[in-house]
From Swiss-Prot:
Bias (Polar residues): 269-281
Cofactor needs: a divalent metal cation
Enzyme Commission no: 3.1.-.-
UniProt-recorded Gene Ontology molecular function terms: 5'-flap endonuclease activity; zinc ion binding
Complex and partners: Forms a heterodimer with a member of the SLX4 family.
Record organism: Giardia intestinalis (strain ATCC 50803 / WB clone C6) (Giardia lamblia)
First and last residues of each zinc finger (SLX1-type): 192-238
Family: Belongs to the SLX1 family.
Protein name: Structure-specific endonuclease subunit SLX1 homolog
One example of a Gene Ontology biological process annotation: DNA recombination
Compositionally biased tracts (Basic and acidic residues): 295-306
One GO CC term, this protein: Slx1-Slx4 complex
Composition skew (Low complexity), residue ranges: 316-326
Amino acid sequence: MTIFSGPRGLFACYCLVAESSESPKRCYIGFTNNPLRRIRQHNRKIAGGARKTSRYGPWRMVLFVGGFSTKVSALKFEYIWTYPTRSRYVNCISATSQKLRLACPRSISTALDVLVTLLIHPPFSLQPLYVVLLDAEGNRVKSQLEQHSVPVFVSTMEALQIEPGVRAPSDIIYAQCTSSNGTTDTTFTDVCPICQDGVSPSNVQCMQCSARFCITCAGKLFTRRNTLIPCFGKCPICKREFQWKEMLRKRAEELVAGRKSVPHKTQAVDGQSSLSQNSSYDDYDTISLLSSSSEPEKDDISRDESGTVASVQPVSSVALSDSSRSPATTSPTKPLAIDPLLSSPRPCALPSDVISITD
C-alpha cells in the first residue's frame, strides 16, 4: 500500500478520462487534496462534483501530479495545464520548436502531451514534483518522464492511501518533538554554517554530511546568477554537489516523520490557536479576501418617535480582552495575513513544505 502525503497534506492536479460512448477519451483536469474522494464526487456518488463532468460520466482517474509546496502553486499548475495557450511561459517554450505547439487539452492524448512538456521544462522541472499513474492510459508518458528524472509511481485507486496534513506553519508544528508534559521544545541544537544562527529541523539538510542549513541561506547558495529559482550547488562542508529539489524531498520526509510523533492537537505557540492534525484543505474554496472578523459590523441605530433614523453609531466588532478597559484606550488588533484561497484568515506561512512519499 502506497501512502502519499506531506507535512501539510497532499496538493495534487489530476486528469480524468470519460468512459461514456458519447464522448470517448474526453478529459477533465482539476485540483484536489484527496483523489479518492474527488473521483467519487465526479461520478456523483457523493456531493461536490464539477458541472463540466456531470454530463459525460462515468469517469476514471488516469493520473495525478503531486509534490506542490502549497495549494496556490498547485492551482497555478492546474490552470496552465488546462489553458496552456493563455500562459506566456508555455508560449515561450512553444516558440522554440514547432513540435511543442500546444493546444487546450480536449482529449486524454493532448492532456498527456501538455503534461510532459510542462514537467520537463523549467520552472516545473526544478520542483520536487512526481507523477502517480492510476490507469493504463498514462503508461505511454512513463518513459518520457523518467528520461528527464521525473519520479513516476504506478498504483491503483484501491491501493492508494492519502494521509492528511496539518494547516499550520512548519516551524510551529515541527520545531521539535513535544515532550512528555505536552509542551514544545524550541531550543535548536544545530547551527547554520553560513549565518551561524540556530536552525530548526524544518530546514534543509545535506544528504552527505548531514549539515543543516537555513532554507534561505541554502536557497541563495543554490541559486545561480542568471536564475531566480535554486537549481543545484555544493555543500560548503563536504563540497558535494546536490540538486535543490532532492534536498527538498529529503526535508519533506523528515517533516512527515516528525509530524507522526506530534500529538493530534498541537499546543498553541506564540499566541497561535491550537490546530487539529486531521484538518485538511477543501478541493475548491471561493477566491475572496476575508476580513479578520467573520461577523459584519452592526450599527446602533436610534430612531425618534416617528420612526425616522436620528443617528447611526457604528459598533466596533473588536471585543475587549479586559472588561475594565475603556473603549478610548482600546488599541487596534494586529491584522492577519489573509490567504485568498482559504475560507478563513490564518497566520503568515513560513517557508513552504513539499510532499513526501512513503511506502
